[in-house]
Curated annotation (Swiss-Prot):
Gene: rpoC
Protein name: DNA-directed RNA polymerase subunit beta'
Organism: Metamycoplasma arthritidis (strain 158L3-1) (Mycoplasma arthritidis)
Region of interest (Disordered), residue spans: 1435-1464
SMART domains: RPOLA_N (SM00663)
Pfam families for this protein: RNA_pol_Rpb1_1, RNA_pol_Rpb1_2, RNA_pol_Rpb1_3, RNA_pol_Rpb1_4, RNA_pol_Rpb1_5
Length: 1464
């Protein structure tokens, strides 16, 4: 692809890796184009940059293209890179001729007159410098750690440090002398020093005098208030001994220069070994102080190792030359009225330059030490503020309006920083946005684009066409026609957009279906038209939502959009593999109305000879839509269908007019659907067998047959239609690949059209089965019609010649056939949508107040409740029950009463199915029973303010999350003032919960994406034999099945042969894909657990293999290599997060384990692996054995002392005691056998504790079960494999305890795969392997431990990541997706992961390639986008004026960024 030199001097596709290291002073000088010596920016009169200042044109490049900054001579583009020689000064300065864009990449530097410590290296991550140096503070015991304030005092010249002790015991090396204890230390040092000299000598007297002065000053008020003069004492000590005391950056420089890293490493390793040995000796229990010390030593060792391995000098952490970033990255903008607005960074640079210059003057004048010291401190502060002003709390440098200046670090971090604002989400050209409105007449793959918008989006193509068709003569002319919206252009625009696609995106982009491709259709008005069925995946509605439009430009982008992103191909949702495109609301209402059966309706029992005749009778109002009539079977379905096959001659099929109309939209080969039993059938064949009674031979009395034999069937509701759509999808979704169809079309010149069906029948489907006869017939018909169309267009029939088809014509036929074949499901869905809208209008459903039917039994129920509550109060007053009991019973009673009222209303609903409101509820179009109960029955109990609940849980009190006085009125009766007030709290809570939830859920998705972003399907089979045993996920508390076994094994591969329980026969071999049928067979055979291949046991590094992942739920086929399953997993878990409740409590009742926490807070708790879950954690058993006794120790405190009979390693039986302090129910009783890690009491398990006691498999199963439970309770189905991916990432790190002979060091956190590789190498060389333990890391920490520092830095804690990457000189090999987006490469997934599998969904080629000779095929380099730049260049040349940059471009990520104010 041609890249303009102006923008991309470095081709991003050629970047192989990115390394980060510490910049040495020489590096900074080599980057620099000159030294900045003056703090001036521009001249206030001439507005020209000052020479030697922060905007100097000689250093940073010219303000105007190709103009010499000294003499002002303007050159041509061709002179770029040469030197100006117009004047002597130009020759002397060697001024290069450059474009003004060079001001964005030319750097300068400031030569500092004294080194400065880089702020990040002593502030970030508890200070790298001090981890390296290991300092002590005077006047404190050695064990006490050095506090950050001590270090800052040293760097900011407030305290001093001993650099060399010179043999003086009072001054040990590396001792920090704080001003408060300085007098004592210096006194001791001088007293020690004086003993070295004979009394009476001059030196002795000198020291004596200094000592007396010190004692006098230290005891005076001034000395006590302000401390003593360090400098004078330092001079004396340094004069009379070898000691050396320093302060500030120079002292740090001295220490770093003289540091022996190798020796330090050995010392630290020895200390760690000592603690580890102690731990082994004492039997795995060591004091917490030792453990903390070891943690500190681990961290120190990590830093020392980083410097040793990267071979960098520690002094590089000091700044000698300060780089000045390019001028255009910190611009000075002229405002109206001659004022200027400047970037904060300029202000910070100016402070540094002013102070640096002043220091130079002081040094030249030989000023007093104190003055120079003060200036040095100010420079240090100025450079700190420039690097990271926000961290300089509590006193960052403030601007005039009292806000902290934005420093260089602030430009990197946070949502508005470089990473997230400019690198991961950019504003893009060729995009726009507008409000959406419904487009009911669109096909599913279309969307309506406003004419004016299309004119702007497709401008270059339109201009090209206008000139080609000679409508306009020049580009300028064409552009003017577009701007004036000349009516001539509209037909041309319509032609231009033919065959092009647009991408529509609705923020927040929660999953991949939030961006889909559509064919644009021009519409009038200013709103985008959206197909009603794609609202579900976009989560859009038409109450003012906006959507963004993007135009794919290159040929390749168009191909991908058409094959992978077109809306009609995205029928299934990714999270559960069920159709996400389901009709709703009016469409459901229409179909429900259409399929109602009414006994005795007008025209019942009539027999029609064909379908058209029936429709005419209905239109003439001779027969009702709901009347049951008969039609000949051939009119309705292919009589070849098994269920209808019979010897008898003429047979009729009985159903209502509406159901005939409904069934007419399906292909003739689809079974006739009579009733809603279709949802109970496991397959269409099974359903078809049950419908024989609706088929009668000729001559039967139809009216009698209907009355006697046929029950009145229910109409189709939302669930039935969803199931029917699933059947349609399974039956008609494309079973062949584009390559297969192309192969048949390639033979069109050799095979007669009538025989083409045989060629299709010979093909194999993608899962290696024979092609279904029906698909072959459909494809043959489509091929025939497309071929005839193409031949007719080329006018062959006129000459009567039989000319063979050429490659272009074959490609045209292929495009037509393939589109119509893959569009079959969508076209049926479109027909369902049209029917739904049509008949919901015809049904004329409306409702009035009289339609809300009430129950007359309600007052007696209310009275019963009131009497019961009064009695409870009496009992409580008499002291018979506690307040907690009274509350719980009250809540229970009112809940029961509401249930009774609901029961009465349900009866009413049954009796009045044709009531409009009840029709809406029954059909599933809108509303549900609980809405109706509030409308006509009673509103019931309301949620309480739950501020105090947490305390209640901790104190084991009953949680009062519900107001105990219910709202007794319904909306139809109207609420009293108190009831209205009471209900406002609950209502508002609902609204605030939703808002909070959206933000939290967005943040969760972002974290999960970061956890799993580099997981891509990379191999066919990793060969792992480590399976995962699955069985029903059962809630151990109430025995409910949360996820049945069948659902867990469909679409997975078996890891071991599966043997039936009943027949004992082998049902499936190892590595067999478990299909729906096979799964049903396994369940029928009574198999209770199956070992499957799982992501958790996959051996693929940075990814998974096809076998361990199984079926791709979105396509219902085995996953393809290149699928970015990590991101799909994150989206599938995050997207439904919004629907999880924020409620921590279920309604009322005693706080059991179930009530403590569910929903969103619990999910976060599991995914972040919290150490302190909400409420009181469960006690888990540390032993395996039998419980022999349970002593309740104290009556007041519920504490159990369990005794467990354990068989130890020596085969002896011993009794172990376990304390269970809790009021929660015990999970076990005497005589139970308990396993290690089993819960002894109710409550959430602390995951880290479980991992310590058991193994990884137990923890993985626990997490999987708990996460599934949260979603399933809310009725959200998510596939296991997605949760497995996240769990695998959480448990992918190992902490090294004993490094053996490996390259790791103790305390390092390494990736499991690196650990295994290293150990395999060591064992093969007969060396000692490393030993470590798996650790569990929450989703917050996993991305920070990523191998890629770019991915980690763009997530959180940017400065910390970059500091560690720099000291260890890390390289980023750009293996994940995020890193590649940052550097602007294609992501290594999908179509960019070469070579992709042939016949996979990513094997996308232009149609013409299937019919060309291989050498003529389109190569990758030919996928060049339209050269849009040449248009822009011509325009620029014509207009010769500055085109203002318009900020109305849309960024894909912008929208969601604003949607979720993220929490970091």
């Amino acid at each position: 692809m041609k890249k303009s030199r102006k923008y991309a001097t470095l081709d991003s596709d050629k970047i192989a890796k990115i390394s980060l290291a510490l910049a040495t002073p020489d590096d900074v000088e080599s980057w620099s184009h000159g030294e900045v010596t003056k703090p001036e920016t521009i001249n206030y009169k001439s507005y020209k940059p000052e020479r030697g200042g922060l905007f100097d044109e000689i250093i940073f490049g010219p303000m105007i293209d190709y103009r010499c900054p000294i003499c002002g001579h303007k050159y041509k583009k061709i002179n770029e890179g040469s030197f100006c020689s117009k004047t002597e000064l130009c020759k002397q300065e060697k001024v290069e001729i450059l474009p003004k864009i060079s001001r964005r990449n030319h750097m300068g530097h400031i030569k500092l007159n004294s080194p400065v410590v880089h702020f990040w290296f002593f502030k970030v991550d508890h200070s790298i410098i001090f981890k390296l140096l290991d300092l002590t503070v005077a006047g404190r015991p050695n064990t006490e750690p050095v506090r950050r304030i001590d270090l800052e005092n040293l760097i900011y010249y407030k305290s001093h440090i001993v650099l060399e002790s010179g043999g003086i015991k009072a001054l040990p090396k590396n001792l920090i002398i704080d001003i408060n204890v300085a007098a004592v230390i210096y006194k001791d040092a001088l007293e020690e020093l004086i003993t070295r000299f004979e009394p009476g000598t001059e030196d002795y007297e000198d020291i004596r005098e200094t000592l007396d002065n010190l004692i006098e000053k230290a005891s005076s008020k001034i000395g006590q208030d302000y401390g003593i003069d360090f400098y004078e004492l330092n001079e004396v000590i340094e004069h009379y001994s070898e000691a050396k005391i320093g302060t500030g950056a120079q002292a740090i420089e001295y220490l770093l220069k003289n540091l022996d890293l190798q020796k330090e490493k050995e010392l630290v390793s020895a200390k760690i070994k000592k603690i580890n040995d102690e731990e082994i000796m004492s039997g795995a229990k060591i004091a917490s102080t030792s453990r903390q010390t070891r943690e500190k030593l681990y961290k120190r060792l990590q830093v020392i190792n980083a410097f040793i391995e990267s071979k960098q000098e520690p002094t590089s952490m000091l700044i000698y030359n300060l780089p000045v970033i390019p001028a255009d990255l910190r611009p000075l903008i002229q405002l109206d009225g001659g004022r200027h607005s400047t970037s904060d960074i300029n202000e910070l640079y100016r402070r540094v330059i002013i102070r640096n210059n002043r220091l130079k003057q002081w040094q030249e004048k030989d000023a007093p030490t104190l003055v120079i010291q003060n200036e040095l401190r100010m420079i240090q502060e100025a450079v700190d503020a420039l690097i990271d002003n926000a961290r300089r709390s509590p006193n960052p440098v403030l601007s005039k309006d009292n806000r902290p200046f934005k420093s260089i670090s602030d430009a990197l971090t946070g949502k508005k920083g470089r990473f997230r604002q400019n690198l991961l989400g950019k504003r893009v050209d060729y995009s726009g946005r507008s409000v959406i409105v419904v487009g009911p007449n669109l096909k599913m793959h279309q969307c309506g684009i406003p004419r004016e918008m299309a004119a702007k989006l497709f401008e270059p193509w339109i201009i090209h066409r206008l000139i080609e068709k000679e409508v306009a003569t020049t580009i300028k002319n064409a552009k003017k026609m577009l701007e004036d919206q000349n009516p001539v252009i509209w037909p041309h625009i319509a032609e231009v957009i033919k065959g092009r696609l647009v991408l529509l995106n609705r923020a927040p982009t929660l999953h991949r279906l939030s961006i889909q491709a559509f064919e644009p259709v021009l519409v009038r008005g200013k709103a985008i038209r959206l197909h009603p069925l794609v609202c579900t995946p976009f989560n859009a509605d038409f109450d003012g939502d906006q959507m963004a439009v993007h135009v794919p430009i290159s040929e390749r982008a168009l191909l991908e959009s058409r094959e992978l992103m077109l809306a009609n191909k995205n029928i299934l949702g990714t999270k559960d593999g069920e159709p996400i495109i389901n009709p709703s609301q009016d469409m459901i209402l229409g179909i429900y109305y259409l399929t109602i059966e009414e006994p005795g309706a007008l025209g019942e029992g009539r027999i029609f000879d064909n379908y058209e005749h029936m429709i005419r009778a209905y239109e003439a109002k001779k027969v009702s839509l709901h009347a049951r009539v008969a039609l000949p079977i051939e009119e309705v379905k292919n009589s070849k269908i098994k269920a209808f096959a019979s010897r008898e001659s003429q047979r009729y099929i009985i159903s209502t007019v509406g159901k005939f109309i409904f069934n007419n939209i399906f292909p003739k080969s689809f079974p006739f659907i009579f009733d809603n039993k279709v949802t109970e059938a496991t397959s269409l064949e099974q359903y078809s067998e049950k419908v024989n009674k609706y088929i009668i031979p000729a001559g039967t009395n139809v009216i009698e047959h209907i009355k006697m034999e046929l029950p009145v069937l229910d109409a189709f509701n939302k669930k039935n239609i969803a199931k029917i759509i699933r059947y349609v999808f399974d039956k008609y979704v494309a079973a062949l690949t584009l390559q297969d169809v192309a192969g048949v079309i390639d033979q069109l010149n050799d095979v007669p059209l009538s025989n083409i069906v045989l060629n299709y029948l010979n093909l194999k489907t993608y899962d290696d089965r024979k092609v279904d006869q029906e698909h072959a017939i459909i494809l043959a018909a489509l091929t025939r019609s497309a071929t005839e169309k193409t031949k007719a267009r080329s006018q062959r029939h006129i000459e009567g010649l039989e000319v063979p088809l050429n490659a272009e014509e074959k490609a045209e036929i292929l495009d037509d056939v393939w589109f119509r074949y893959t569009n079959m499901v969508a076209s049926i869905l479109d027909d369902i949508k049209d029917l739904g809208f049509k008949y919901s209008s015809l049904s004329g459903i409306t409702f009035a107040i009289s339609d809300i039917l009430e129950t007359d039994k309600k007052p007696e129920y209310i009275a019963e409740g009131d009497a019961y509550i009064a009695q409870l109060k009496q009992y409580y007053n008499d002291g018979l029950i506690s307040d907690d009991d009274r509350y719980s019973l009250t809540i229970k009673k009112w809940t029961d009463i509401k249930a009774k009222v609901q029961g009465e209303l349900q009866q009413i609903i049954k009796e009045n199915p044709r009531n409009p409101i009840i029709t809406m509820i029954n059909s599933g179009a809108r509303g549900n029973i609980s809405n109706y109960v509030q409308l006509a029955g009673m509103r019931g109990l309301m949620a309480n303010n739950t501020k105090s609940t947490r305390a209640d849980v901790k104190n084991e009190r009953v949680v009062r999350s519900t107001v105990e006085i219910p709202v007794k009125s319904s909306f139809i009766e109207g609420l009293t003032a108190f009831e209205f007030y009471s209900s406002t709290h609950g209502t508002r809570k609902g609204a605030t919960d939703t808002a909070l939830n959206t933000a939290k859920s967005g943040y969760l998705t972002r974290r999960l994406v970061d956890v799993a972003q580099n997981i891509v399907v990379r191999k066919e089979n990793c060969g792992s034999d480590y399976g995962h045993i699955v069985r029903d996920i059962v809630d151990t508390k109430n025995g409910q099945i949360i996820v049945p076994l069948k659902e867990r094994i469909i679409g997975r591969y078996a890891n071991k042969p599966i043997i039936g329980e009943k027949t004992k026969q082998e049902l499936a071999k190892r590595n067999t894909l478990i299909t729906d049928k096979l799964a049903q067979k396994i369940i029928d055979e009574g198999v209770k657990e199956v070992e499957i291949r799982s992501v958790l046991g996959c051996n693929t590094k940075n990814g998974v293999c096809k076998m361990c992942f199984g079926k791709d739920l979105a396509t219902n086929r085995v996953v393809n290599i290149g699928e970015a399953v990590g991101i799909i997993a994150a989206q599938s878990i995050g997207e439904p997060g919004t629907q999880l409740t924020m409620r921590v409590f279920h309604t009322g009742g005693v706080a059991g384990a179930e009530d403590i926490t569910g929903g969103f807070p619990r999910l976060i708790e599991l995914i972040d692996a919290h150490e302190q879950p909400w409420g009181r954690p469960a006690v888990i058993s540390p032993y395996e054995g039998e419980i022999v006794e349970d002593l309740v120790e104290d009556k007041n405190v519920n504490s159990h002392l369990l005794t467990i009979k354990v068989v130890n390693s020596k085969k002896e039986t011993v009794n172990k005691k376990v304390h269970v302090y809790t009021t929660k129910k015990l999970r076990v009783k005497v005589g139970d056998h308990v396993k290690v890690g089993q819960k002894l009491s109710e409550g959430p398990v602390i995951v880290k504790e479980l991992l310590e006691l058991t193994d990884t498999i137990t923890v993985q199963n626990y997490l999987l079960k708990e996460i599934q439970k949260i979603y399933r309770i809310q009725g959200i189905a998510i596939s296991d494999k997605y949760i497995e991916i996240i769990i695998r990432q959480m448990m992918s790190k190992i902490v090294i305890h004993d490094p053996g002979d490996s390259k790791f060091f103790a305390g390092a956190i390494v990736d499991i795969f690196d650990y295994q590789e290293e150990n395999a190498t060591l064992l093969s060389q007969r060396k000692r392997p490393a030993f470590g333990k798996v650790v569990i890391k929450g989703a917050k920490q996993v991305p920070l431990l990523s191998d890629s520092f770019l991915a980690a830095a763009s997530y959180q804690e940017t400065s910390k990541i970059l500091v560690h990457a720099a000291i260890s000189s890390r390289s980023d090999s750009l293996s994940g997706l995020k890193e590649n987006i940052i550097v602007g490469k294609k992501i290594p997934a999908g179509t960019a992961l070469y070579p992709f599998e042939s016949h996979s969904k990513y094997d996308i080629r232009p149609s013409i390639d299937y019919f060309r000779k291989p050498e003529l095929e389109t190569s990758d380099s030919e996928f060049i986008p339209v050269d849009l730049e040449s248009y822009h260049q011509e325009l620029e040349d014509e207009q010769q004026q500055i085109i203002e940059v318009d900020d109305s471009d849309i960024s894909v990520e912008d929208e969601e960024n604003d949607f979720y104010e993220n929490e970091d």
